[in-house]
């Protein structure tokens, strides 16, 4: 497979870099140059361009990214597809639920109560077809979730099907069944990223939501995993553990994690029954500022976890505001714009946090492309009136305001804090 894929979009294109699993947005003029570079050396493209100086400037910017071959051509191909007029050809990331069963009963889980009976899981053959369709849409980033994915007996075959299709899968697990042997198998699959959930730096905070003894079990499993497979520790920030995020970073370093991710608990699924776990906006911001203070970067506008060369992904409102405007039209929420989810039995939803009532249709009945383009819930979220709405998480808006058209209270507080003290606003890096 080529290192790069140029994915045509309504605004120009997105270039997917397989080496970093990142998308880079380009406008129409830059896209014209990129498409010419697929078959023609840079020197010739610049010479023939109507604005040689602009073309040369773009070429110079591409070089440090290692986008060009030694002969000056782009190190990639253009995806053969025609994008829609008002939304992405395909989501930047798709979260696929590969199993509904789980060994834990986490009280803050985004999923509906588990196990969920009556849902016939997608077969390996069906998943393979889905993965290939996602690749044809330029949707290369894949999250495999559950339930607990490690309980699926053919999981390694599922991962192989995903990588064979050209996707970059990330496997999210509670880590309970993570053996050295399994970690070694995952490590052999170069494109697989292991995402292990922890919800605190101590057994007291973690076990309070995941069950007695789970912290010690998972930490023990992870002590040798870093030598066998690259993994990230994913921390869910709640009102109970926000005070110990600095110790969470230290724990991630101690266990050899390659990345640490901090996200707030969302008011969805089982978490709807634990409203006391929801951090306030200010509590979450204090946690982010604590993480930012640990940064080795002199730029105070960015928050980094001091793990080897990796950036913290905070999922904060300001991070969404910084990135969403580049590639989507509308409110800036990722649901139906840059991400979506597929349930264990193939139901496609703009975001799993919205719950099953927002499932549009099943891939057993319609193609993923059709659902992404014209599913009723996708159309609903994309049609939100931008004159009366100013952004934020649709799941939080649904929980607090009773509608996806309501306003996310965190977005309101974020805008208020910017007006009151713009210099204190924390900007963070985000991986889409």
Which residues fall in each region the model found?
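Flexible mid-to-C-terminal extensions adjoining Fe-S/redox cofactors in radical SAM and related proteins
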Residues: 347-432
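N-terminal pre-core extensions flanking Radical SAM catalytic domains
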Residues: 1-114, 135, 410-414, 418, ...
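Conserved alpha-helical substructure of the radical SAM core
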Residues: 57-61, 67-193
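The −1 position to Zn-ligating cysteines in a subset of zinc-ribbon hairpins
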Residues: 101, 105, 329-332, 389-392
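Conserved, mostly hydrophobic/aromatic
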Residues: 102, 171, 196, 346, ...
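Radical SAM enzyme [4Fe-4S]-AdoMet core and its adjacent flexible, acidic
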Residues: 2-6, 192, 197-199, 204-334, ...
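Cys/His-rich metal-chelating microdomains
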Residues: 101, 105, 109-112, 336, ...
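Short, charged low-complexity linear segments at domain edges
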Residues: 72-90, 309-322, 359-380, 385
């Amino acid at each position: 497979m080529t290192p790069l894929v140029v994915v045509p979009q309504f605004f120009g294109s997105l270039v997917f870099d397989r080496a970093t699993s990142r998308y880079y947005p380009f406008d129409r003029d830059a896209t014209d140059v990129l498409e010419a570079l697929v078959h023609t050396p840079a020197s010739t493209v610049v010479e023939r361009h109507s604005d040689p100086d602009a073309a040369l400037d773009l070429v110079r910017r591409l070089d440090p990214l290692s986008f060009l071959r030694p002969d000056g051509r782009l190190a990639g191909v253009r995806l053969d597809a025609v994008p829609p007029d008002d939304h992405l050809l395909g989501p930047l990331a798709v979260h696929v639920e590969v199993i509904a069963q789980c060994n834990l009963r986490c009280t803050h889980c985004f999923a509906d109560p588990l196990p969920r009976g009556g849902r016939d899981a997608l077969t390996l053959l069906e998943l393979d077809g889905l993965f290939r369709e996602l690749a044809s849409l330029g949707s290369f980033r894949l999250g495999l979730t559950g339930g607990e994915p490690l309980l699926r007996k053919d999981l390694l075959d599922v991962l192989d099907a995903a990588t064979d299709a050209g996707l970059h899968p990330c496997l999210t697990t509670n880590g309970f069944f993570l053996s050295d042997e399994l970690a070694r198998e995952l490590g052999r699959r170069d494109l697989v990223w292991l995402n292990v959930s922890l919800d605190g730096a101590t057994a007291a905070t973690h076990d309070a939501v995941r069950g007695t003894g789970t912290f010690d079990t998972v930490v023990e499993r992870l002590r040798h995993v870093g030598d066998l497979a690259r993994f990230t520790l994913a921390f869910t920030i709640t009102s109970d553990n926000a005070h110990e995020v600095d110790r969470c970073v230290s724990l991630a370093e101690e266990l050899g994690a390659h990345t640490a991710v901090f996200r707030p608990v969302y008011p969805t699924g089982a978490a709807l029954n634990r409203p006391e776990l929801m951090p306030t906006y200010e509590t979450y911001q204090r946690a982010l500022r604590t993480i930012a203070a640990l940064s080795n970067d002199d730029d105070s506008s960015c928050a980094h976890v001091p793990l080897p060369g990796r950036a913290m992904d905070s999922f904060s409102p300001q991070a969404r505001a910084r990135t969403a405007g580049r590639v989507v039209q509308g409110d800036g929420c990722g649901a139906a714009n840059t991400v979506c989810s597929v349930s264990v039995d193939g139901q496609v939803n703009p975001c799993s946090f919205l719950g099953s009532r927002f499932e549009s249709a099943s891939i057993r009945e319609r193609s993923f492309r059709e659902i992404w383009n014209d599913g009723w819930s996708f159309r609903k979220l994309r049609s939100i009136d931008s004159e009366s709405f100013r952004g934020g998480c649709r799941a939080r808006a649904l929980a607090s305001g009773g509608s996806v058209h309501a306003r996310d209270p965190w977005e309101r507080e974020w805008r208020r804090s910017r007006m009151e003290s713009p210099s204190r606003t924390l900007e963070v890096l985000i991986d889409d």
